[in-house]
Amino acid sequence: MEKTTLLPGKPNVGNLFSFFAKKKAGLMGKFVPGWTDNKIDALLFTPKTADIKPVRLPRGIDQFVIKTRDGEIQAYQTGKGPTVVFVHGWGGGAHQFFPLMRGLAQCGFTALSFDHLGHGLSDKMPATLQQSIATTNHVLHTVQNSEDGLCAMIGHSTGCITIANARPALVKDRPLFLISPIFNYKLYVLKKLVKLNLHADQVKQYANSFTNTYRSEYQKFELARTLARYGDYTLIAHDESDSESTVADSEQFCARYPLTRLLITKNTDHVRIINSETVWQELKSHLNYDDTTVNFTAKVIYQ
């Protein structure tokens, strides 16, 4: 009997392209392993920028450029007084902090946030952890030498790692407020790797390669190692339902370093926690600001 194959109508061109692209990557990975690793590096550490639109500035927030050794970054500032610097995580942006910044401005602080290289309207390039640390050092140093001076730092996600790995002279004895911190950077990267939907062989090859690179280049940056020296003036805010980073990691750290305060929220997930009322109240307290007359809202008011 003649064998037949049932074809489901017209072939899907997109699927065919994906099929051949993965085949090509698989073959290239066998003959030139570094090629695959470089391509995956680009996918992992270069945020998508095709849909980025100019930021619509909220009322009272100024936008300007900071020139660093590696490129130009977009910065945003409001208020007058001691400066609180906000540091976003991978894939985030300065805009995430606008409501908190507006609130701090009403409390007599200068609030400054910036887009890391590769993010927002800053220069486009791979956004590695080392690059983020270098940029943060530049910003903190600039603020420290400004008229208002550096008062405190607020980080979110991998931005918490960035702050803890900044130059100690810039961080020591200043209040740190860390939101949804990533305590396991290796696991964080491997989770991102899986989400790329690559061929299993490519994932395995890159995971093995990254594990070796992690030991030599990234392990020293892990938050539990570097935050310990600042634990007595750090407050961590973490949501119990956070799917990006488990709250158990924050609980474990605070159990080991009991002077570190821990705020656990409910139903605000990894991102919405930033501009929650609970975080706002704890932030004021952490900065020793007790005036309860300042109203806070997560709603952004534009020009």
Residue ranges and their predicted role:
Residues 94, 101-123:
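Conserved alpha/beta-hydrolase
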Residues 2-65:
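An N-terminal hydrophobic leader/cap segment in hydrolases
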Residues 230-231, 236-238, 242:
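Short beta-strand/loop motif that positions the catalytic acidic residue
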Residues 168-213:
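Hydrolase active-site cap/lid region
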Residues 268-280, 295:
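Catalytic histidine-centered segment of alpha/beta-hydrolase-like enzymes
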Residues 126-145:
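Alpha/beta-hydrolase active-site loop
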Residues 154-163:
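Gly/Ala-rich beta-loop-alpha elbow adjacent to hydrolase catalytic centers
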Residues 100, 223, 232, 246-255:
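Short alpha-helix in the alpha/beta-hydrolase fold that links the catalytic acid
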